[in-house]
Amino acid sequence: MSNTILQHLPIGQKVGIAFSGGLDTSAALLWMRQKGAVPYAYTANLGQPDEEDYNAIPRKAMEYGAEKARLIDCRNQLAHEGIAAIQCGAFHISTGGVTYFNTTPLGRAVTGTMLVSAMKEDDVNIWGDGSTFKGNDIERFYRYGLLTNPSLRIYKPWLDNQFIDELGGRQEMSEFLIANGFDYKMSVEKAYSTDSNMLGATHEAKDLEYLNSGIRIVKPIMGVAFWRDDVTVKAEEVTVGFEDGVPVTLNGQSFSSAVELFLEANRIGGRHGLGMSDQIENRIIEAKSRGIYEAPGMALLHIAYERLVTAIHNEDTIEQYRINGLRLGRLLYQGRWFDPQALMLRETAQRWVARAVTGEVTLELRRGNDYSILNTVSPNMTYHPERLSMEKVENAPFDPSDRIGQLTMRNLDITDTRDKLGIYTHTGLLTVGKDSMLPQLDKK
């Protein structure tokens, strides 16, 4: 049995808890204090769009018995990692061309490292959070926590049978808080659960576990319900500017920080419901789950970035960018964003792809993921329409005789290909004739 994971409350020891202020972590913190642990509460400010007062959360933790409560501002680091993911195309999950932008994995990478770093400052070497044993987060936090503090031990109340026996459900936790003098009112149960940060929101579980229930039951927190006929969405033009792979302007406006740029990108994209998607994905443990996602700012920046990538880079570079992006997206999803194999892929894309991406892209946003690209401008473009113009041009880069020569050279590999197909036919791997897929390859 692992010595890293504690299955019973460590009495008399400091225990750090990732504290959200919700029912679960509030009850857990009070319970740990009453049972003899010394709880320290750490709250990550990730720019959650559904959080109204971050400063109230540490105060609440102190009321529930925290020895110390700290609010850790993680927004700058989250914005930095979000831009890195866009630069690398680190997104491996998509359906019908609509992308999930790995916003929860990005949030976990930042939370897992920054909260554990804060705990080290307070000499807290035991960490607990609210992730369950069936999900991805339990492994992501485990990896990031131990990367940051190799002496870290893990205690999760939700893996402690005593906690589960005493406070196994939301009703029991609510009654526990009320019995201890806290006027806690359970929030109205939604048909799904929501987790969010500045980059995006995840809606999953409960009714959304059933595939006959979909986006129409979701109330967006970062944008509009674009699928509803009573929601008015007006078309809007927006221009996104990049310098050396970094988004720097929206409609010509510069921003004091990447955080402010993301917030404005969220507002613009959110007015249209841009970046919402419904995905079936494979969790780390290879079981499938379903989520409905929002990421209006990430989607806006990603579309503009990829337009510039295709205008600037050659085909082989774009191919490597896409292949490596799929691999890197999966590593990010698995909680390996800071592993050597991920850093290698990140460095490749950020150095050799992103650094050349300078320019502006103008889009018209409509409803949901419906948009058009109106203009693309870059000093680094290798797109030159005169090279392939259907009109007669002066000083053309090549003429018909050049193309005849190029096509003649193709005879070499065409002949080789025909010979190989003949070998496959002779061995029975292929058949030729009227009803075959290669009816014209018989010897004539």
Curated annotation (Swiss-Prot):
L-citrulline binds at Y100, N136, R140, S193, T202, E204, E281. Gene3D superfamilies: 1.10.287.400, Argininosuccinate synthetase, chain A, domain 2 (3.90.1260.10), HUPs (3.40.50.620). SUPFAM superfamilies: Adenine nucleotide alpha hydrolases-like, Argininosuccinate synthetase, C-terminal domain. The keyword Amino-acid biosynthesis applies. GO terms for cellular component: cytoplasm. This is Argininosuccinate synthase. Keywords: Amino-acid biosynthesis, Arginine biosynthesis, ATP-binding, Cytoplasm, Ligase, Nucleotide-binding. It catalyses: L-citrulline + L-aspartate + ATP = 2-(N(omega)-L-arginino)succinate + AMP + diphosphate + H(+). NCBIfam families: argG (TIGR00032), PRK05370.1 (NF003779).
